[in-house]
Amino acid sequence: MKFACRAITRGRAEGEALVTKEYISFLGGIDKETGIVKEDCEIKGESVAGRILVFPGGKGSTVGSYVLLNLRKNGVAPKAIINKKTETIIAVGAAMAEIPLVEVRDEKFFEAVKTGDRVVVNADEGYVELIE
């Protein structure tokens, strides 16, 4: 299934989805050295490394942008990020770390996507796709 998206940062990625319905704070919420989610939420203990991170949006400190950059430098960044509504902190961090970042407004996408699903993010062509 394909869904339209709005590119915040450019690029293309394919990988396994890591999905939460909760907002994420990168500062304190994700370990910048390991990519493990530390925040008390449904994906606590999971690694964002090499996955398509799907969550409604960010929360928290402006330092979160630098956490995303450090995740990239440490080789544990997500391949791409999908939000419902992207805040500036996530956008700046994704741009600095060269991580494709898109917004999907279609609620059907968020109802359908589950952790472990194969997802293609194509910010350049404006779509995300759930691979069956």
UniProtKB/Swiss-Prot annotation:
Record SUPFAM superfamilies: LeuD/IlvD-like
Keywords annotated in UniProt: Isoprene biosynthesis, Lyase
InterPro entries: PMDh-S-like, PMDh-S-like_dom, PMDh_S
Superkingdom of the organism of origin: Archaea
A GO molecular-function descriptor: hydro-lyase activity
Annotated active site: S61 (proton acceptor)
Reactions accelerated catalytically: (R)-5-phosphomevalonate = (2E)-3-methyl-5-phosphooxypent-2-enoate + H2O
UniProt GO BP: isopentenyl diphosphate biosynthetic process, mevalonate pathway
Enzyme class: lyase
EC number, UniProt record: 4.2.1.182
Keyword ATP-binding recorded: no
Pathway terms, separated by semicolons: Isoprenoid biosynthesis; isopentenyl diphosphate biosynthesis via mevalonate pathway
Function: Component of a hydro-lyase that catalyzes the dehydration of mevalonate 5-phosphate (MVA5P) to form trans-anhydromevalonate 5-phosphate (tAHMP). Involved in the archaeal mevalonate (MVA) pathway, which provides fundamental precursors for isoprenoid biosynthesis, such as isopentenyl diphosphate (IPP) and dimethylallyl diphosphate (DMAPP).
Stated name of the protein: Phosphomevalonate dehydratase small subunit
Species of origin: Archaeoglobus fulgidus (strain ATCC 49558 / DSM 4304 / JCM 9628 / NBRC 100126 / VC-16)
